Every structure is written in structure tokens, then in C-alpha cells.
């Protein structure tokens, strides 16, 4: 069915990225997570982006940040709509992938941009975040046949490329 297809697509995308950005709603971090994410992402480094921080309780949020740190993730609280704290996303991605890039460097591989993808349930602000990180509007071209195959890498900052994953 639909879920199995989504799962397959995510697994395919995962092969191409170094880090996963899991986007959740800062007001309801746990219930705004996709339950199959953990199973699919498995061992990939993960940055948990708590969006809509402007609308959430700061005390609660620091508890949630600690919860995600304890799980081995790199949490960042942002307000995508107003473009707040977005610089921290790139910094967290650099931290989350440092080990992998050290290994690549040791093997003599050339330095390259970190490749990331965003996962999250609908209405957590994925499009807003992508557009703000990219500092431009990424066309919503979901209904034309064949677009899903044409994934594009969106440059973010100096060290990051974001895989535009329609509908994940």
C-alpha cells in the first residue's frame, strides 16, 4: 500500500544522504513524529529540528532537546516561518556527520558538501523550512508525472545540500 511505497522511497533516498533532518512540531514533539521513521532511518546520523519554537513552552522544549540528545540525536529548535535559528541546522549537520567525514578524509576522499534529507509528517512546516534554508522558493511540482524521479539537491549555506523529497 501507500505506507510501504513511502517506506521504500525513504530507504532509497537514505542511501544518498549523510544525515537525516527529522522535522517535528516543537509544541508536540513526540506526537508529531512519524512512527516508522526510527525503523527506516536506523543508524543514520539524525538532526531533530523542533519547528515552531516561537509557539512552544521553552522549559518543555529544553526537556525535549535533552530527550533527543539522550537518544543520540542532534536537536535544534527553530522558527522556520520567521527564519529564526536556521544557522544552527547547518552547524548541527556538521557535528552529526563529523565522524563520517573524518573517515572519508582518512581514506583520501575529497571534501564535499554534507547531503541531507528532511523527513516529517504533513503540517510540521517542511516546505517552509526547505524554502527558508534555500533562501528561495522551491517550486512545488508534485503533480506532474515523473517529477519524483528528478530529485534536486538544494544548496544550503556553504557545507550543506538538501535533497528535495516530494511527499515524504
List each language-model region with its residue ranges.
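N-terminal accessory targeting/assembly segments
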Residues: 1-43
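Conserved nucleotide-binding/hydrolysis micro-motifs of P-loop NTPases
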Residues: 27-29, 53-56, 81-84, 147-148, ...
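Conserved, well-folded catalytic cores of nucleic-acid-processing
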Residues: 13, 17, 40, 71, ...
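Glycine-rich phosphate-binding P-loop
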Residues: 115-135, 139, 165
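Canonical P-loop GTPase G-domain recognition
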Residues: 53-120, 138
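Switch I (effector-binding) loop of TRAFAC-class P-loop GTPase G-domains
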Residues: 2-7, 108-111, 134-160
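Conserved beta-strand/loop subsegment of P-loop NTPase cores
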Residues: 18-24, 42-54, 72-77
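Conserved catalytic network of the ASCE P-loop NTPase/AAA+ motor domain
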Residues: 11-15, 39-42, 81, 148, ...
Amino acid at each position: 500500500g501507500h505506507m510501504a511505497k513511502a517506506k521504500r522511497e525513504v530507504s532509497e533516498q537514505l542511501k544518498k544522504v549523510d544525515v537525516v533532518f527529522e522535522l517535528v512540531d516543537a509544541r508536540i514533539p513526540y506526537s508529531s513524529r512519524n512512527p516508522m521513521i526510527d525503523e527506516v532511518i536506523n543508524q543514520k546520523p539524525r538532526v531533530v529540528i523542533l519547528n515552531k519554537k516561537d509557539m512552544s513552552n521553552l522549559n518543555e522544549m529544553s526537556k525535549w532537546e535533552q530527550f533527543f540528545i539522550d537518544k543520540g540525536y542532534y536537536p535544534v529548535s527553530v522558527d522556520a516561518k520567521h527564519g529564526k535559528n536556521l544557522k544552527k541546522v547547518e552547524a548541527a549537520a556538521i557535528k552529526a556527520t563529523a565522524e563520517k567525514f573524518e573517515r572519508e578524509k582518512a581514506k583520501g576522499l575529497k571534501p564535499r558538501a554534507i547531503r541531507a534529507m528532511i523527513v516529517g509528517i504533513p503540517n510540521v512546516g517542511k516546505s517552509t523550512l526547505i524554502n527558508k534554508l534555500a533562501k528561495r522558493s522551491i517550486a512545488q511540482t508534485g503533480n506532474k508525472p515523473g517529477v519524483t524521479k528528478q530529485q534536486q539537491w538544494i544548496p544550503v549555506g556553504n557545507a550543506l545540500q538538501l535533497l528535495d523529497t516530494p511527499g515524504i
